[in-house]
């Protein structure tokens, strides 16, 4: 799958032929066809693990009782996913064929659940804009070559902290006992 990902990243899905994948892998086109019947099958094999992770992120966040904890959990999971899949993130976000496959994939409901965690219940315009900016910003930061010099942990911390400032729950910042609630710093 790395061979296909390399080619998708360089040429886009539409610009990558099965013959190119076969050549890159050092096998025949027939061997690729034997394993995968269509290019869509290859794309789904490449993006499938990340989509499964999205579902796990949404499920883990849903298990949290408080909205703030759900938001932290979802944001940590998304940041980790982006850092681990930088090349894939760009393909999923910007390739029209991949975007179409993602829209039709069962994990789409998980994406919507995470978006709901980012916006909160009954979101106003500010919450919707914040969620859109965070979603797009996380993707762009994950593929920005200017950030290649940052370690994964440093990038993780900055992505989480910056996104948190935009998404912070719009609930009171005092706990039920009257004390201040500590702001998260990137890991739960």
Where are these regions (language model features)?
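Solvent-exposed, amphipathic alpha-helical segments
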Residues: 3, 7-10, 53-60, 137-141
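Helix-turn-helix
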Residues: 3, 7-41, 45
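Short alpha-helical functional segments enriched in proximate histidine and acidic residues
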Residues: 7, 81, 166
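Short amphipathic alpha-helical/adjacent loop interface patches that line ligand
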Residues: 36, 51, 75
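Hydrophobic alpha-helical connector segments
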Residues: 41, 45, 56-90
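Hydrophobic/aromatic-rich alpha-helical bundle segments in the mid-to-C-terminal region
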Residues: 69, 89-90, 94, 100-188
């Amino acid at each position: 799958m790395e061979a296909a990902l390399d080619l998708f990243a360089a040429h886009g899905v539409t610009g990558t032929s099965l013959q190119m994948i076969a050549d890159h892998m050092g096998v025949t086109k027939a061997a690729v066809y034997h394993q995968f019947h269509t290019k869509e099958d290859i794309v789904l094999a490449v993006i499938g693990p990340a989509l499964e992770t999205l579902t796990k992120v949404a499920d883990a966040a849903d298990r949290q009782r408080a909205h703030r904890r759900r938001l932290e959990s979802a944001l940590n999971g998304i940041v980790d996913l982006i850092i681990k899949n930088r090349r894939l993130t760009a393909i999923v976000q910007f390739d029209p064929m991949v975007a179409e496959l993602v829209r039709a994939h069962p994990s789409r409901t998980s994406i919507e659940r995470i978006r709901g965690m980012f916006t909160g219940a009954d979101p106003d315009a500010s919450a919707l804009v914040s969620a859109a900016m965070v979603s797009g910003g996380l993707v762009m930061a994950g593929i920005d070559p200017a950030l290649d010099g940052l370690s994964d942990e440093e990038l993780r911390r900055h992505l989480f902290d910056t996104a948190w400032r935009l998404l912070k729950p719009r609930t009171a910042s005092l706990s039920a006992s009257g004390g201040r609630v500590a702001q998260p710093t990137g890991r739960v």
